[in-house]
Regions:
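A short alpha-helix-loop-beta-strand transition element characteristic
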Residues: 120-134
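Patatin-like phospholipase
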Residues: 2, 8, 26-120, 149-160
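Short secondary-structure boundary/capping segments
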Residues: 22-24, 126-129, 139
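Intrinsically disordered, low-complexity segments enriched in polar/charged residues with Gly/Pro
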Residues: 18-20, 48, 123-127
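Internal, conserved structured core segments that host functional sites
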Residues: 132-153
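Small-residue-rich anion-binding loops in enzyme active sites
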Residues: 1-29, 142
Length: 160
């Protein structure tokens, strides 16, 4: 599948200003909790990029919904990755909108983020699985209702 940005005239005009690079290997003891909130998560992602640029890499991260997706990029140490996909593909009907709704029964296709976009900018799985760090995601059981905490692994990411 070739991924192009649809509606090129609507591409984020400051894509080149999004930071790029890798976070250092410095790990800070402590826990960070990232809430969800769909595209409000862009603010969180910008803060995480700033922290990674300044060697603030927490040992444990708990993510809920969009916060879990932001946490995956943070744990992989990929500065700017979340902003690039969300700002670069915000007008792509394979990612968001009616076409996405018809494919994924949701206005945002999480499988696009996890599978399709990963072909363009792969998540650094070696860094993601750094044994010094821990990522926990909150998952809701759609059949029973209660939520539970799950240690994030590549397997859990592939469920989306």
């Amino acid at each position: 599948m070739k991924l192009d940005i649809i509606n090129r005239e609507k591409v984020y005009s400051r894509m080149e200003s999004i930071p790029n690079g890798r976070a250092s290997d410095v790990i800070i003891p402590g826990c960070l909790v990232l809430e969800g909130g769909a595209f409000r998560g862009l603010y969180t992602q910008g803060l995480l990029d700033f922290w990674m640029q300044n060697d603030i890499n927490f040992q444990t991260v708990i993510g809920v919904s969009a916060g879990a997706l932001s946490a995956a990029a943070y744990m992989s140490g990929q500065i700017g990755r979340s902003a690039r996909v969300n700002l670069g593909y915000r007008h792509n009907s394979n990612y968001i909108g009616v076409k996405a709704l018809s494919k994924a029964h949701s206005p945002i296709r999480l499988d696009f983020l996890i599978h399709d976009y990963d072909q363009i900018e792969p998540l650094d799985m070696e860094r993601f699985h750094d044994s010094r760090r821990r990522l926990v995601v909150v998952a809701t059981n759609c059949q029973t209702g209660p939520s539970s905490l799950k240690r994030a692994t590549a397997l859990i990411l592939s469920w989306a």
